[in-house]
């Protein structure tokens, strides 16, 4: 089947890993001759890259699918693809539920999209969910931004948190080689990208599956070593990373972040609960005391560092006292941002089978109370920016005010100021902050710093 005049549309649900996968799959489709369509109803191939972390995200996928499945009866040459974690979890059951589907593919198969589609175009209905070694992707991704980019450094997760479906759907940990990561970053630097976020479901596990050991007995390749190896890539001005696991977060990594000028002083370290009994039930492998020590160590080396995290309320058996321990941790630490969620039972996880599930009313009440505290603490944290001069990397026009541009500080605070996006996009601008809100800032531009060649 010729693809030169065909159009594609990708809808992405879920995490940054999914967004990075979608960019790679878009690059493969364009390499095959497909053109991007903003409107899914004008596309000849529709791909849903799905998330199964929470039930509402999964149900949204089925809602979208239902509309396009009806359309396929009127347009038989429409190609329907479900990728990502729902595809991995459901496999052939998806075909029984939505027989109009052409391709069901798990996240490990993202780089194999061309081969899988060629089988579809040969007349086959394809399910690709078997465990595979992830191939290096030589196709240039179609990036959603021209300023910032994601680079995967490790796929999969070997943890077995009792609430989490990720290891079931993303497979075991597979680290890319340091050379492969640096090569991709160097290409992005040549293309003009200024900020790169290194991605992993559990990024601190990087290198555990790679061969070799140091004379001291540690793994030859660790995430800390990777940061030292890639921090001087020409053209790249900022490096971020996510997501960290408290169980493996080391002082050596913190020291590296403090020493390396391109690494942003922003850490995303989920704690999930502030209660030790619940952390044990979740199989997280640390205590709230250890988590507090990590944050204390970060702030000892980098007093102004921004801290963000994830938290779950309403985990099976959570008592009011245990929930209040979470509130106390949030109140004591003062996060710059906290992603919160009510516990959602996921198929194939131990916690989903436990009998001590909480009511939706209790979960909703606790989520509301936690979110209120999060907003209060974030507003308090924002006060430190008032009157300061912050370096902002300009990314886009403010969609709500065409006279303003927007970007992020090194600490990941969204910042708005007057300016022309055509002049400033991709530039580092010194901005004096004159207005602060819980999760964003506004200021006046002071000067622009051109990115210096190395």
UniProtKB/Swiss-Prot annotation:
Gene Ontology cellular component list: cytoplasm
Annotated function: Catalyzes the methylthiolation of N6-(dimethylallyl)adenosine (i(6)A), leading to the formation of 2-methylthio-N6-(dimethylallyl)adenosine (ms(2)i(6)A) at position 37 in tRNAs that read codons beginning with uridine.
UniProt record, GO biological process: tRNA methylthiolation
NCBIfam families, per the entry: miaB-methiolase (TIGR01574), MiaB/RimO family radical SAM methylthiotransferase (TIGR00089)
Cofactor names: [4Fe-4S] cluster
SMART domains reported in the protein's UniProt record: Elp3 (SM00729)
Gene that specifies this protein: miaB
EC numbers, comma separated: 2.8.4.3
Domain MTTase N-terminal span(s) in chain numbering: 6-122
EC class (word): transferase
Protein's name in the database: tRNA-2-methylthio-N(6)-dimethylallyladenosine synthase
SUPFAM superfamilies assigned to the protein according to its UniProt record, in alphabetical order: Radical SAM enzymes (SSF102114)
UniProt-annotated binding residues for [4Fe-4S] cluster 2: 157, 161, 164
All copies of domain Radical SAM core, residue ranges: 143-380
Assembly description: Monomer.
Catalytic activity: N(6)-dimethylallyladenosine(37) in tRNA + (sulfur carrier)-SH + AH2 + 2 S-adenosyl-L-methionine = 2-methylsulfanyl-N(6)-dimethylallyladenosine(37) in tRNA + (sulfur carrier)-H + 5'-deoxyadenosine + L-methionine + A + S-adenosyl-L-homocysteine + 2 H(+)
GO molecular function, one term: methylthiotransferase activity
Keyword Iron appears in the UniProt entry: yes
Binding site for [4Fe-4S] cluster 1: 15, 51, 85
């Amino acid at each position: 089947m010729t693809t030169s005049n065909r159009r594609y549309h990708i809808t992405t649900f879920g995490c940054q890993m999914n967004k990075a996968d979608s960019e790679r799959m878009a690059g493969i489709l364009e390499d095959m001759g497909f053109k991007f369509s903003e409107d899914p109803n004008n596309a000849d191939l529709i791909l849903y890259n799905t998330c199964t972390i929470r039930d509402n995200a999964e149900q949204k996928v089925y809602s979208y699918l239902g509309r396009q499945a009806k359309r396929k009866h009127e347009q038989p040459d429409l190609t329907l693809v479900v990728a990502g974690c729902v595809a991995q979890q459901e496999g052939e059951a998806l075909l029984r539920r939505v027989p109009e589907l052409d391709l069901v593919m798990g996240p490990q198969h993202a780089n194999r999209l061309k081969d899988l589609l060629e089988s579809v175009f040969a007349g086959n209905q394809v399910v690709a969910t078997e465990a595979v070694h992830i191939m290096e992707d030589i196709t240039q991704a179609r990036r959603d931004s021209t300023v910032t980019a994601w680079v995967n450094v490790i796929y999969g997760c070997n943890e077995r948190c009792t609430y989490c479906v990720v290891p079931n759907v993303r497979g075991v940990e597979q680290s890319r080689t340091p050379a492969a990561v640096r090569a991709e970053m160097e290409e992005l630097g040549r293309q003009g990208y200024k900020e790169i976020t290194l991605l992993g479901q559990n990024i601190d596990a990087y290198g555990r599956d790679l061969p070799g050991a140091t004379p001291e007995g540690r793994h030859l390749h660790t995430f800390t070593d990777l940061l030292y190896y890639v921090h001087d890539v020409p053209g790249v001005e900022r490096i971020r990373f996510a997501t960290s696991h408290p169980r493996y977060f080391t002082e050596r990594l913190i020291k590296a972040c403090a020493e390396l000028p391109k690494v942003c002083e922003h850490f995303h370290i989920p704690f999930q609960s502030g209660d030790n009994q619940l952390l044990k039930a979740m199989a997280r492998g640390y205590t709230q005391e250890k988590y507090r020590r990590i944050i204390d160590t970060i702030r000892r080396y980098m007093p102004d560092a921004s801290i963000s995290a994830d938290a779950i309320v309403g985990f099976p058996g959570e008592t009011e006292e245990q929930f209040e321990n979470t509130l106390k941790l949030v109140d004591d630490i003062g996060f710059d941002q906290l992603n919160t969620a009510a516990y959602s039972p996921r198929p194939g996880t131990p916690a989903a089978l436990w009998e001590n599930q909480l009511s939706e009313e209790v979960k909703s009440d606790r989520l509301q109370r936690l979110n209120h505290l999060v907003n209060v603490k974030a507003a308090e944290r924002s006060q430190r920016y008032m009157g300061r001069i912050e370096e902002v990397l300009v990314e886009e026009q403010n969609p709500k005010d065409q006279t303003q541009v927007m970007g992020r500080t090194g600490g990941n605070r969204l910042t708005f100021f007057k300016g022309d996006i055509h002049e400033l996009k991709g530039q580092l601008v010194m901005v004096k902050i004159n207005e602060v809100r819980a999760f964003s800032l506004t200021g006046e531009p002071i000067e622009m710093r051109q990115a210096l060649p190395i």
